[in-house]
Amino acid sequence: MAVYACADLHGQGWAWDAIKNRLAPSDYFYFLGDAVDRGPDGVRIMQEILDRPNTTYIRGNHEQMMLDGLCGNDDAIALWAYNGGWPTQKVLANMPDTDVESLLQEIEALPFYAEYTNPDGIRIIMTHSGYTFDMSDWYKMIWDRTHYYKEGMIPANTLIVHGHTPTPSLCRAIGEVIPEGMVWYDNGHKIDIDTGACFTRKACLLNLDTLEEEIFYESDSLDAE
């Protein structure tokens, strides 16, 4: 058994199918949010992750926008649509109301973070967007990007694994250069595993025991067809 994490698949069915097939039934899987929106397959991805045994699904900002949009007012629906929610809204509109309600109940129960200590004794904290001292501040755990610019805030022997900001965008913002669509490492304390699957056509699966990543390419799935 191994323990893996992935984030921000954003409706890319090719990425989820590759990762799903890579995972053994006994592997534990942490999904760090944002299964839906931008791409066409988000609802299917969300449902399959929710149904998978040995899995913790952490809430992302797109799950929150979906929840707010379906339970809220026109402004919440507009914000969700503006951020890529149209493909998800289209699928949900064709689902039975009872199925949508059941899905909303599952989303509402999603945690905002999870912790895992790997075999090397490293405490790994996983949230959608990053780390905050106040782990009750759910808004920061799904939206914050300011922690990229802060030094010395991570406790010793602790690693933050997150998504939310595609690594190409993050590196442009902080002036670092890595190959497009690859994982970002920050001095052994933070790992961003959002490789921007819906833009770069690359998705990441991080082994939390070894801290080694595996990259999946859309071109590989097309070649296999």
Segments (PLM) and residue ranges:
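N-terminal active-site segment of His-dependent metallophosphoesterases
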Residues: 1-48
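Active-site-proximal beta-strand elements of phosphoester/diester hydrolases
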Residues: 2-10, 123-130, 191-193
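Residue-level marker for buried hydrophobic side chains located in beta-strands
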Residues: 5, 29-31, 57-58, 125, ...
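Divalent metal-coordination and catalytic microenvironments
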Residues: 8, 34, 49, 60-61, ...
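Active-site environment of divalent metal-dependent phosphoester hydrolases
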Residues: 10-15, 37-40, 64-67, 134, ...
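Active-site neighborhood of divalent metal-dependent phosphoester bond hydrolases
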Residues: 38-116, 121-122, 147-148
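His/acidic metal-ligating clusters that form di-metal
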Residues: 98-172
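Conserved beta-sheet core of the metallophosphoesterase superfamily
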Residues: 141-220
